[in-house]
C-alpha cells in the first residue's frame, strides 16, 4: 500500500468523484475500497493499487470490519484509479465470512453511551446509521445479538431461533442511547429525558423479546397507562408510545390478528417477562393472554383421522400433536386461574319412600346406580379440572350407551369391593331406573351439585381477570353441552332427556353469564382506574335530575324515596372516591343485603329478590335515558358500568336466593329455564303474596286502582311503602 503525501493528517474522508483528467476505467470485477481525505494539496498524485483478489460486486453495500466517522465508497477499477484528491489508504474487501481471533478485545460496532453489539461468525447485511437497543440481525451464519432485555441467538440456514430471558435491569448507558435516538428522530426536548428514562426502564423491566409470540397493542398501552397512574406520570399518547416501544425493541413487527370483524393489532416478537408483576395483575385481559404461548406450540384442533396429514417441514413437524397434548399444554398455563383444590360434595341418597320398583329393578340395582353415577360424576370433575373439555362427550357416550351385557358395560370404571358383580349397569337396566320418578329426581339433584361444583372450579371469582383463551374455551364448552348430552341419550325416554338437558342447559347458561360478567369486569376496570373519566362521569351525573327520575319511576317501582336518595348519594360518593372494582363490588353487595334483609326467612324472599332486580334495572335505565338526552360526554362509560352492575346484581341475588332456599344457584336458575314448563304453583304463591300485601294497604288504595306510592306523594304525613 502507498499513501499520498498530502492527505496524511486529515481525519475526514469524502466520496470520490471522477475528474476530467482521469483515464477511463476498464471493465473489471476487481473491487477497491478507497478512503479519501477532504483536503489535499493541488497536484497530489494518486498511485494505482492492484489487488490480488477478484471479488464479485454485490448489489447491496456491505459493512467492513471497522466503522469510521468518514464516508466509505466502493469504486470499480483496474490498474487505473480516479485521481480526485490524494488517496490516503486503500483496503481490500472480502465478502466471505471471517473468523475473528478470540483474543481480540476490539468490538465490531461501538455505539454511543457505551452500548455494545458483538457479532460472531459473519457480518450482518447492513449496519444501521443509528444505534438503538435491541438490534435484530439475521444472516446465514450464527450472529449473537446482545440487547438490554434479552439475548437472541439466531441459527443457521434453518432459521431456527431461541430466546434466553435476561431479567437484569438495563444499564444507564442503554437508556441514554435510546433517549438520544428518540431526541434525534422525534425532536424530544432534553427536559423530558427523565420522564422518558422512567418509561423506557419500565418497558425493559416488564417485557422481553421472544420469537413466535405476540401481544395486543392495546394491552401494552393499557399497562403503560396504569404505570403512569400509579407513579403520577404524564403518559404519552398511543402513537408516541409505539415509538417508545420500537426504540427499545428494534425489529418489532405489527400484525393484525383475530377473527374477521374482531381483529386487533398485535406487536409480534415481544412478551411479558415471567417475573413481571403484570402477570399477576392483568387488569386488561380481553386479548392479552391469547398469544402468551408461541404460536407453533398451539396447533388448531383437527379430527383424529386427519392427523396424518398434519405436520410442517423440518423439526416443527413433531409439534403438531393430538388434541389431548394440545389441551395439556394450554392447561399448564390456565391451571392458576381455576380452583383445582375444590372438594366435590357428597350426593344425597335417593328417597324411594313407598315407591314400588318396576319389574326387573331391585334395590341392588339402585345401589349400583348410586355407585356408578358417583364415579361417573367424579370422572367428569377430574376431566374439567384438567381442562380437557373434549373428554366430556366421550364420558357421556360411554355411560349412557353401555351394552346390553354387563361385560360390555363401562369397564373403565373399576368394580367396588362391596359390589361383587361389578359396578356396571347395562343400558336397558339404566333406562328402567331412570323411568322411576324418585330416581329421576335424585339424579336431577345430583346434577345440580355436580354442575355447581364445575362452575366453582372453572370460575372461582367472577371479577378476577382470566386469559381470553380460557374464557373462550369455557364458552365453547358451554355451547356444546346440550348437543353432546342429547346425542348420548338419544335412545332414552323423552322425559328423561328433558330432565337431564334442562339441568345441563342451566349449567351452560350460567357459564355464559359468568364469562360475560368477567369480560365486563375487565373492561370496566380500566374505566374505573381512569381519573379523567371518573371526573367526567361525576360531573355528568350531578346534572341528572334525580327528582324527576324518582317522580317517573315511583309509579312503577313503588320504592321509598329515602332509599333511592341514599343509593344516589352513596353512588356519587363511591364514584368521587375513585373506588376500585373490588370496592364497588362490596358496595353492591351491601345494597343487596340492606334491601333484602327485611325478607330474610320469608317464603316471599325469591319474589322480593326478583322484584328488586326489576326495580334496580328500571331506575338505572331512567338515569341512562337522562344522560342520553343531555348528550353526556361520559355516556359510554356509564353504559359500560351499568351493564356490569346489572349483571353483578343478578349474580348476587342469584346466590342470595340459593342460600335462602337451601338450593344451589344452578337449581335456582334451572327453575325457570324452560318457559314452556314454568311452575304454576310458584306463580300462584306470588299471586297469593300480592293479595296479602294488597289487603294490608287498605280498601281505599284498592278502590282507586292506583299504586300506593303514587297516591301518597300528595300526603307527606303517610309513610312510604318499602321495596
UniProtKB/Swiss-Prot annotation:
Query: What does this chain do?
Result: Transcription factor that acts as a key regulator of spermatogenesis. Acts by regulating expression of genes required for the haploid phase during spermiogenesis, such as genes required for cilium assembly and function. Recognizes and binds the X-box, a regulatory motif with DNA sequence 5'-GTNRCC(0-3N)RGYAAC-3' present on promoters. Probably activates transcription of the testis-specific histone gene H1-6.
Could you tell me which residues belong to the region Disordered? 1-46, 292-332, 688-723
The record's annotation in Pfam families points to:
BCD_RFX, RFX1_trans_act, RFX_DNA_binding
| Sites bearing Phosphoserine, chain numbering | 28, 416
SUPFAM superfamilies registered for this protein in UniProt = Winged helix' DNA-binding domain
Kindly list the places in or outside the cell where this protein is found, as annotated in its UniProt entry: Nucleus; Cytoplasm
Summarize subunit and interaction data from the UniProt record for this chain.
Answer: Homodimer; probably only forms homodimers in testis. Heterodimer; heterodimerizes with RFX1 and RFX3.
Q: Residue spans with biased composition (Polar residues)?
A: 322-332
* Residue ranges flagged as DNA-binding region: 199-274
* Comp. bias intervals (Low complexity): 10-20, 308-321
- Result, substituting residue 110 to K: In a breast cancer sample; somatic mutation
Q: Name one GO biological process term.
A: acrosome assembly
Q: What is its main location?
A: nucleus
Protein name, as recorded: DNA-binding protein RFX2
| GO CC annotation, single | nucleus
Q: What are the disulphide bonds in this sequence?
A: none
Keyword vocabulary terms for this entry: Cilium biogenesis/degradation, Cytoplasm, Differentiation, DNA-binding, Nucleus, Phosphoprotein, Spermatogenesis, Transcription, Transcription regulation
The family assignment reads: Belongs to the RFX family.
In the record, what terms sit under GO molecular function?
Answer: DNA binding; DNA-binding transcription activator activity, RNA polymerase II-specific; DNA-binding transcription factor activity; DNA-binding transcription factor activity, RNA polymerase II-specific; RNA polymerase II cis-regulatory region sequence-specific DNA binding; sequence-specific double-stranded DNA binding
Q: Name the species this protein comes from.
A: Homo sapiens
Lineage of the organism: Eukaryota, Metazoa, Chordata, Craniata, Vertebrata
